[in-house]
Amino acid sequence: MRAEEHAPPAAPRDALIVAHGAPADPAPQESVLQALAAATAPHLPPGWRIRGATLAAEGALDAALDGLHAPLIYPFFMAEGFFTGTLLPRRLAEAGATEAEQITPFGLYPALPALMARVALAATTAAPASTNLLIAAHGSKVSRTSADSTYAMAAALAPLTGFARILPGFVEEAPFLADQARALGHGICLPFFALEAGHVTDDIPDAIKEAGFAGPILPPIGQHPDVPALIAAALIRAAGA
């Protein structure tokens, strides 16, 4: 039984899920965040209010914050870094959300490895011991945090899955996704991404095709139907801390 199941119900809070979004085409991702907030709401105790916004959509963050009191901010990001450590706090301050409380981002939530393992195992068509897992992730040319969180996820998945090999591959840094896919040859590709944006729809399939990797590319983990419940659990836990 999870720790949050032992805790008394948290007092009603306001909350906001925030993602980076897509600056070139912000509207679709903005809609996804609002839908995610709506899907999370039923998992929260009565009285909670939750909204979603992206940083990329002009005015969206300010509009989402309007009327919220001391909201919990849920960063829908896969790692700590510039966006969670610098840009998001700055944008919150500029919006006047001085009482907002930012919590751990999605990619570092302790329950995420179990979901990743369950999703990957459900996609296997052979014994796990003969199956490879390729974790497709963003990476960064300037920061180690994205890679570090991906390697930590790979390490957490090893005992949970029993896969033959688990390799991370990155879009923006070495070891690049195509190289890791080529090294594995076959298996399952699970994108360690929050949203289904350009890297997921274009870069990952291109790298897999270039490598001749045999196996399915699963939807990004952030789009799994169980994610709203994970977000709600994280918010409830943060409110009761």
Regions picked out by a protein language model, each given a short descriptive name:
Residues M1-A241:
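Active-site-proximal alpha-helix that buttresses catalytic centers in soluble enzyme cores
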